[in-house]
Swiss-Prot record:
The keyword Secreted applies. It comes from Locusta migratoria (Migratory locust). The modification Leucine amide is found at L13. It comes from the Eukaryota. One of its GO terms (molecular function) is neuropeptide hormone activity. It is found in: Secreted. Belongs to the pyrokinin family. Potent mediator of visceral muscle contractile activity (myotropic activity). LOM-MT IV seems to be a more potent muscle stimulator than LOM-MT I, II and III. The lineage of its organism: Eukaryota, Metazoa, Ecdysozoa, Arthropoda, Hexapoda. The keyword Secreted applies. Keywords: Amidation, Neuropeptide, Secreted. Its main location: secreted. GO terms for biological process: neuropeptide signaling pathway. One of its GO terms (cellular component) is extracellular region. This is Locustamyotropin-4.
């Protein structure tokens, strides 16, 4: 499922 970044993971950089 896509997150806020639109990726299959949540890159919280």
């Amino acid at each position: 499922r896509l997150h806020q970044n639109g990726m299959p993971f949540s890159p919280r950089l």
